[in-house]
Amino acid sequence: MEWINEKAKTLKQGAIRAMFDRANTMTGVISLGIGEPDMPTPKLVCEAAKEALDKGITHYTPNAGTLSFRQAIAEKSYLKDLHYDPKTEIIITNGGMGALSLLFLVLLNKGDEILIQDPQWLNYVAQVAYCDGTAVRVPTDLEHNFEMQPETIEKLITPHTKALMINTPNNPTGSVMTRETMAKIAELAVKHDLLVISDDVYNTLLYAGEEAPCIASFPGMKERTVIVNSFSKSYAMTGWRIGFVAAPAEIVDRMTKCQENFNACANAPGQYAATVALDHPELCEELRQTFERRRSILLDGLAKIDGIRCNRPNGAFYVFADISSFGLSSVEFCNRLLDEQKVVCIPGSAFGECGEGFIRIAYTCSDDNLYEALNRISYFCKKLIK
């Protein structure tokens, strides 16, 4: 008898994990591949979790999460001016990925289409396919700062299109959608009666005075927007698996029922600690300042390397660098860089067809490691040119 179902057989190891597996067999490797803060969770947040344990906050919470946490998100986060009802319009999830998986489970019927940027974080496409949906790629390019163009989006809308996904600041490109573009996309969503899924996980990591407006704040959009976020990037809490969704009550209700049947709730001490974290926005600012400094180090270093071209991304902690001048595919470039110089970068092709010819570089390591990695990349590129 065959034990594994056909859907599960379609899931493959991503290129990111494959690179890490190779790197783990080596010594002296510097990783510019990992998409998470390298620093530990702030001590204040850890102490709050310890306090939760000491208080016996170790049991199931309501399926939608503790009301106190949902109220804190509604009143103290960037959503406060949108007046979400914490009782009916917010759900706490097992990280942002848990939020997306619940959402797609309750949203998609077979054949439903979701428009997704290319290049884009690879898990979106896998989750949509697993839930019987179809991911329709919206091509972007370096010349337009990897920003989806409204006219391109509109050409891809069909009678089967149910939703559009946006992620700003963006993984893998670090680009930030302008207010003007977002306004046009909002108009398209209203015109074509589309749901917009806004993955805001990097929205505290903005540089050079950049702003990241929330699409739910545009006219006619709150009632057709699902906001997905987590504490992973903003508070260096990737391992805690604390995320949330703010959305119309009907969607949150169905997600809550789905969560009840699949995983009950997010962990109780983590919810308690994240509630405390919301009282300390300075923790986000400290992380942001660290990454802004590293961004400058990386961009200044890359600018000195012949053959590499990139924009100046104003968000997240990634640079998406064009390496096409070297005549190697993005996979070949990254494999050789790892083998010859022991530096991990991620092939742009892992994020879609439009990522070919690029590599994703994450500045999620110490300043010293970043300088050393730049020296190694520079040496590697000089050898390729000779």
Residue ranges and their predicted role:
Residues 2-6, 10-11, 20-26, 30, ...:
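PLP-dependent class I/II
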Residues 56-60:
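A short acidic, glycine-rich active-site loop
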Residues 69-70:
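Class I S-adenosyl-L-methionine
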